UniProtKB/Swiss-Prot annotation:
Function: Part of the ABC transporter complex HmuTUV involved in hemin import. Responsible for energy coupling to the transport system.
Membrane topology note: Peripheral membrane protein
Enzyme class: translocase
Lineage, top ranks: Bacteria, Pseudomonadati, Pseudomonadota, Alphaproteobacteria, Rhodobacterales
Native species: Roseobacter denitrificans (strain ATCC 33942 / OCh 114)
Protein name per Swiss-Prot or TrEMBL: Hemin import ATP-binding protein HmuV
Length: 261
C-alpha cells in the first residue's frame, strides 16, 4: 500500500516539463516535493492527481489510478491545490462539507466541524468564505480536504492527503500547526504528499523528500541524506550550507526553536 509514480513525463505543447520522474510515498510518512521555481513540483503533483495528461503510471494503494473512477479516487485521496476560487458565496461550513460529499462516506458526517476545529476556525463556520483573509481561506481548504479523508485508514487501507504548498500564505504559527496536522495524519497511518518551498519546515517534518531541478529528480531520500550543501546548491543555483548559522552574529529566526502558545 503506497503511492508509486513511475516514469512520469509531461509536455505542455511541445515543451517537455517533466522528464521520466519516479516518485514513491509511503503511508505513515510525510513525503515532500521541493525544488526551485519552475522545477516541476506542482506539475508532478498534478500528474499524480490526474489533473494533467502524462505518460507513465501512477499506482495508489496498488491500483492504477488511470483505471479508477473519480468516486473511487475521491474516497481515498484528497487534493489541496495552490489556490481555489469559488464562484458562489458559500459559508465556511458549506465549503468544508464539500469534502465529505467528495469523499463519499456518510459515516464521516461529523468530520466538517471536527476538521474546522482542528484548524482552529470552528467559530467561523457561518461566515462567508470570501470574507476571510487569504491565510484563513487556505486553512478552510485544508479543513475541506481533511474532512474528505477524515479517517486516515479505512478497511486496512491508507488514505492520502495530496497538498500543493499547504503553508505558502500562512504565518509561522499557522505553518507549524498545519505541518503538525500533516504529521499527525501520517502518524495515524495515512499518507501525506506535500509540495513545499520552506526548506526548514521540510527538514523538520518530512520523512522523505524528492528534490526536483529542471523537470528531473535530482535526489530522493530522508532529509538528512539528501539535504546536503552540494545537492541543494546544485538544485537552487546558489551556494547553500546546511546546519550553518549566518555569519557576523546576524539575527535569524528558525521554526525549529518555536513553541506554539
Amino acid at each position: 500500500m503506497s503511492l508509486d509514480a513511475a516514469d512520469i513525463t509531461v509536455k505542455l505543447g511541445r515543451t517537455p516539463i517533466l522528464h521520466g520522474i519516479g516518485f514513491c510515498a509511503k503511508p505513515g510518512e510525510v513525503s515532500a516535493i521541493v525544488g526551485p521555481n519552475g522545477s516541476g513540483k506542482t506539475t508532478l503533483l498534478r500528474a499524480i492527481t490526474g489533473d494533467l495528461p502524462f505518460d507513465g503510471t501512477v499506482r495508489l494503494n496498488g491500483k492504477d489510478t488511470s483505471r479508477m473512477k473519480p468516486w473511487e479516487l475521491s474516497a481515498i485521496r484528497a487534493v489541496l491545490p495552490q489556490s481555489a476560487v469559488l464562484a458562489f458565496p458559500f459559508t465556511v461550513a458549506e465549503v468544508v462539507r464539500l469534502g465529505v460529499q467528495a469523499g463519499v462516506c456518510a459515516r464521516d458526517c461529523d468530520a466538517p466541524m471536527a476538521a474546522l476545529s482542528q484548524v482552529r476556525l470552528a467559530h467561523y463556520a457561518d461566515r462567508f468564505y470570501h470574507e476571510l483573509s487569504g491565510g484563513e481561506q487556505q486553512r478552510v481548504q485544508l479543513a475541506r480536504v481533511l474532512a474528505q479523508v477524515w479517517r486516515p485508514v479505512v478497511g486496512g487501507a491508507p488514505r492520502w492527503l495530496l497538498l500543493d504548498e499547504p503553508v505558502a500564505s500562512l504565518d509561522i504559527a499557522n505553518q507549524l500547526e498545519v505541518m503538525e496536522i500533516t504529521r499527525a495524519y501520517a502518524s495515524a497511518g495515512g499518507g501525506v504528499v506535500a509540495v513545499m518551498h520552506d526548506l526548514n519546515l521540510t527538514a523538520m517534518f518530512a520523512d522523505h523528500l524528492a528534490i526536483l531541478s529542471g523537470g528531473q529528480c535530482l535526489a530522493a531520500g530522508p532529509p538528512e541524506q539528501v539535504m546536503t550543501d552540494a545537492i541543494l546548491s546544485q538544485a537552487y543555483g546558489c551556494a547553500l550550507r546546511v546546519n550553518t548559522p549566518p555569519p557576523h552574529s546576524a539575527t535569524y529566526v528558525l521554526p525549529h526553536a518555536a513553541n506554539r502558545l
